[in-house]
Amino acid sequence: MFAVIKAGGKQYKVDRNSIIKVEKIDGELGSKIQFDQILMIGEYSKPSFIGTPIVKGAVVTAEITNQLKDNKIIVFKKKRRKNYRRKAGHRQELTELKILDITKQ
C-alpha cells in the first residue's frame, strides 16, 4: 500500500517502512506523528483513492528517526561592471521519518 502525503508544502509518495526526509518537524527522536493530509492512497494491484483535495479518513503514522541538516547551498548575486556582489549560504533543517502504517477507514 502507498500514499501521497503533504508535509511542509511538498508532496511525498510513501510506502510502509520507507524512510523519507521532510522539512523540520519539531519532536523528540522516537516520537510518533500522524499525517492527516493524504492526497492519494492506493495499492499497486487495485484502484487508488484520489482526494478532492484530501482523502477523508486516511492517516499515515510515522516515527521520527533523525533530526539533521541538508548540504549547504550557496546563493550568489552579481551585477557586472558595478562591483556589486552578494554571497549567502543556507542549510535546510530536515527531519528523517520512518513510515510505520498507512490506514483508511
From Swiss-Prot:
Gene Ontology molecular function, alphabetical: rRNA binding; structural constituent of ribosome
Entry keyword RNA-binding: yes
Keywords: Ribonucleoprotein, Ribosomal protein, RNA-binding, rRNA-binding
Record function comment: This protein binds to 23S rRNA in the presence of protein L20.
Family according to the record: Belongs to the bacterial ribosomal protein bL21 family.
Quaternary structure, from the entry: Part of the 50S ribosomal subunit. Contacts protein L20.
Protein name: Large ribosomal subunit protein bL21
Gene (UniProt): rplU
